[in-house]
Every structure is written in structure tokens, then in C-alpha cells.
From Swiss-Prot:
Binding-site list for Zn(2+): 253, 256, 355, 414
Reaction(s) this enzyme catalyzes, per UniProt: L-histidinol + 2 NAD(+) + H2O = L-histidine + 2 NADH + 3 H(+)
Role, per record: Catalyzes the sequential NAD-dependent oxidations of L-histidinol to L-histidinaldehyde and then to L-histidine.
Gene designation per UniProt: hisD
Record: residues binding substrate: 231, 253, 256, 322, 355, 409, 414
Pfam short name (any one): Histidinol_dh
Active site: 321-322
Entry's Gene Ontology molecular function annotations: histidinol dehydrogenase activity; NAD binding; zinc ion binding
Naturally occurring in which organism (per UniProt): Shouchella clausii (strain KSM-K16)
Listed name of the protein: Histidinol dehydrogenase
UniProt remark on cofactor binding: Binds 1 zinc ion per subunit.
InterPro entries: Ald_DH/histidinol_DH, Histidinol_DH_CS, Histidinol_DH_monofunct, Hstdl_DH
Record key words, sorted: Amino-acid biosynthesis, Histidine biosynthesis, Metal-binding, NAD, Oxidoreductase, Zinc
GO terms under biological process: L-histidine biosynthetic process
Length: 425
């Protein structure tokens, strides 16, 4: 990782992998979607064979596979999954929005009705690792919101099934509609349905570039959570921070994939040098050191600022997915941070605490979109309808003002819809 010294007022230009596919990649995704729409299940079987090298005999996970998963999962792992589910559920219960109504003296009733989505599809990535935490973070808020129909897609392994931890987590959450599908073809199936796959109203969950491009392509026909890019971490630290902790946390995101971003922002050159050395030392023994090493080489940086105030400005410019504040008084700085998906305060709030266990959602805005976007929440799985009930008295009192506005905009039929009622009063 390179140390980059910033002058006071100097803007940061951080290289990120981005979310935009090439013309060829976009064309490939569009072809996959259209083929799934036309050929249904057969397209899913063909694409799974082509891209994953797996010959599917059944698109759906069976009850026998779910039962078998419990026989192959370690009990400490299962206990950890159950506790994580409980923590995430308790946090998201606090987010539930309630319908509300108010009645005015003239009899007008105004309000907002909150109702859950009918059907949601959760994409759970496979490939380089198993991700039961993705199931928890996507399914739990949907359940808290009241969604009744939750299905899941995840790419099958070469053995024709999914990892035991993935299946057991789904079973613990009561998700039994699970399709052995991944990639753009899985997104297309959830969006438009096939002979086997039921279409849904919203698709959530992370995936590779082709999954992200497919979600972007089907948006509008169905809802999506967000177009999530590679994982990011930014550590804001002062000279009191433990360089070993900081290095470990940077590596915790760098090991996700080669496009992950890992950044330190500090006014302390001494800390930056110590973190640089510590990162190299810890990287050498990581099982995924090739992946993490490429990420740090491409998208890693150690920024040294002229002051702590400038460091905070840099953080707000970056608008990172994960922000750790590793300073002597982290709470004192919290109010000055404007843009971050999740904020971890203090030396013991390591980013993996939020990834797996604490309760807040780990599906977060990336690529600087924390400037305007928020973490996945219960709100993402509900709809809000405005309720308007005008009384005769209210319309008589306000009808003239309504027609004035309608005619100002040149919409005569709007005005007449009010006039015809006023004439009957």
C-alpha cells in the first residue's frame, strides 16, 4: 500500500473499480435476460452448464438437501448463525414503520398506510466462499416488514447442491423456496418467472458484475435494493490507533475480492508507516493473500493529511461503505461525518462485528453512493400509500383554491371535477 501525503485543502482522487460494465458485458447480460424470458427453465439449465459447469437435474433445493445440511454443519457454527439471526432481527424490529391517520375538525381524514411487498427474491452469492450472512441480512428485514413470499437463489456447487451453512441458514429463517441458480440468469428468472421460478416484486442481495448489470437491466419491471459495487473500508485514525488493528481491518475487506477498496486516512505519518508494515506482515499469512494483495495494490491507499479536520473532510469526500473511527475520542467526531454507509466507533468495533453479528444491516451503499443512499432496511420491503378522505365541508371550503391551481396549470378537466361537486352543494 502506498502512503500519499495530502496538502491542506487537496481533494482526494481515489481509484475505485466502478459499477459500469463494458458494452460487451451489457450485451451479454441483455441476451441472457431475453433468452430466459423466451426459453424459461431450459435457458436456466443451459446457462448453468455453460457458466458454472454444473448439470442441473432439479432447479429447486429439496427437503432432503435441507435436512442433510444440518448433519454436515458444525454445532458451534449453527449456534453462531442462530445468535446472529436474533441480533439482526432485534435491530430491525426497531425500524418498523406504522400506518397513521389524522382527522381534522372539518372531517377530513389524511394518513399513510404501510403494507409489505407480496414477494421478494434474495440473491445469495457463491463462488469463492459461502455467505450465510447475506441470507440473514436480506431475509430478516423482509420478514420483519411482513413479506410472506420470500425465495432465494444461489449458484450450485459442482456437487449439485449448496453449502450446508447456506442451506441451514435458510432453513433456520424458514426460507424453503430455494433455487440452485446464479448469475444474470437467476436475476432474470426472479424478475420474469419461468415454469419453475415464481416471479417476485423486488430482488435484493449482492453478486458479481453480471448480477449487478442484470439487476440494473430489470429495474423498472421489478424493484431492486441497490447496484452494489465491491466492498470498501475507510479507517479514520489518529496517532493513538493500534496499527495492527487497523491493518487487520483493512485486510478484512481486501480479502473479499480483487476490486475491494481499503483506505486509511490519518494525520499521523508515523501511524501510516506502521500500518503499511503491519499490513504487509499480516498479508503474508492470509489464506486469500493473492486476492487481498491485488486489492491493496489496485485500490488501497494510506492518506496522510495535514490535520484531523482535513482527515474528516477526506472521509466525507470518499463517502465510504464502511467507516471505522479509530481515534482517542471517536464519539466526538461522529457528528462531523456526513457520508458513510455504516460507522464503527472505537478500537473494539471491528468491521466484521457489523458484517456478521451486531444487528445493523451489512448491505450498504458503495462507490460513493453513501452521499445519497442508505443501508438495506425494513423500509426497503414495504410500500406506503397516501390516504385522503375529504368531507363535504372540506371540499366546500377549499374547492375554489383547488380549481385556481388546476386552471393555472391549464388542466381544465381537473378544475371541472371539483366544480361539478361544488355545484351540487
Amino acid at each position: 500500500m502506498k502512503i500519499i501525503e495530502l496538502k491542506e485543502g487537496e481533494a482526494v482522487s481515489l481509484k475505485r473499480s466502478g459499477l459500469h460494465g463494458s458494452e460487451a458485458e451489457i450485451a451479454t447480460v441483455n441476451t441472457i435476460i431475453e433468452t430466459v424470458k423466451k426459453e424459461g427453465d431450459q435457458a436456466l439449465v443451459d446457462y448453468t452448464q455453460q457458466f458454472d459447469g454444473v448439470e442441473l437435474t432439479d432447479l429447486c433445493v429439496t427437503k432432503a438437501e435441507l435436512d442433510n445440511a444440518y448433519r454436515h454443519i458444525d454445532q458451534p457454527v449453527l449456534a453462531a448463525i442462530r445468535q446472529a439471526i436474533a441480533n439482526v432481527r432485534a435491530f430491525h424490529e426497531q425500524q418498523k414503520a406504522k400506518s397513521w391517520f389524522q382527522t381534522a375538525p372539518d372531517g377530513t381524514i389524511l394518513g399513510q398506510r404501510v403494507t409489505p411487498l407480496d414477494a421478494v427474491g434474495v440473491y445469495v452469492p457463491g463462488g469463492k466462499a459461502a455467505y450465510p450472512s447475506s441470507i440473514i441480512m436480506n431475509v430478516v428485514p423482509a420478514q420483519v416488514a411482513g413479506v410472506k413470499d420470500i425465495s432465494m437463489v444461489s449458484p450450485s456447487g459442482k456437487n449439485g447442491t449448496l453449502p450446508p451453512a447456506v442451506l441451514a441458514t435458510a432453513a433456520e429463517l424458514g426460507v424453503h423456496t430455494i433455487y440452485k441458480l446464479g448469475g444474470a440468469q437467476a436475476v432474470a428468472a426472479l424478475a420474469y418467472g419461468t415454469e419453475t421460478v415464481r416471479p417476485v416484486d423486488k430482488i435484493t442481495g449482492p453478486g458479481n458484475k453480471y448480477v449487478a448489470l442484470a439487476k440494473r437491466a430489470v429495474f423498472g419491471d421489478v424493484a431492486i435494493d441497490m447496484i452494489a459495487g465491491p466492498s470498501e473500508i475507510c479507517v479514520l485514525a489518529d496517532e493513538k490507533a493500534n496499527p495492527a488493528y487497523v491493518a487487520a481491518d483493512l485486510l478484512s475487506q481486501a480479502e473479499h475480492d480483487e476490486d475491494a477498496t481499503a483506505v486509511l486516512v490519518t494525520p499521523s505519518r508515523k501511524l501510516a508507516e506502521a500500518v503499511q508494515q503491519e499490513t504487509a506482515r499480516q498479508l503474508a499469512t492470509l489464506p486469500r493473500k493473492e486476492i487481498a494483495g491485488r486489492a491493496l495494490e489496485q485500490f488501497g491507499a494510506l492518506y496522510v493529511t495535514a490535520s484531523l479536520a482535513q482527515a474528516i473532510e477526506v472521509v466525507n469526500q470518499l463517502a465510504p461503505e464502511h467507516l471505522e473511527i479509530a481515534t482517542e475520542e471517536p464519539l466526538a467526531l461522529l457528528g462531523r461525518v456526513k457520508h458513510a454507509g455504516a460507522i464503527f466507533l472505537g478500537s473494539y468495533s471491528a468491521e466484521p462485528v457489523g458484517d456478521y453479528f451486531a444487528g445493523p444491516n451489512h448491505v450498504l451503499p458503495t462507490n460513493g453512493t453513501a452521499r445519497f443512499a442508505s443501508p438495506l432496511s425494513v423500509d426497503d420491503f414495504v410500500k406506503k400509500s397516501s390516504i385522503i378522505s375529504y368531507s363535504k365541508t372540506a371540499l366546500a371550503e377549499n374547492g375554489k383554491a383547488i380549481t385556481e391551481l388546476a386552471r393555472l396549470e391549464g388542466l381544465e378537466a381537473h378544475a371541472r371535477a371539483i366544480d361539478i361537486r361544488l355545484e351540487d352543494m
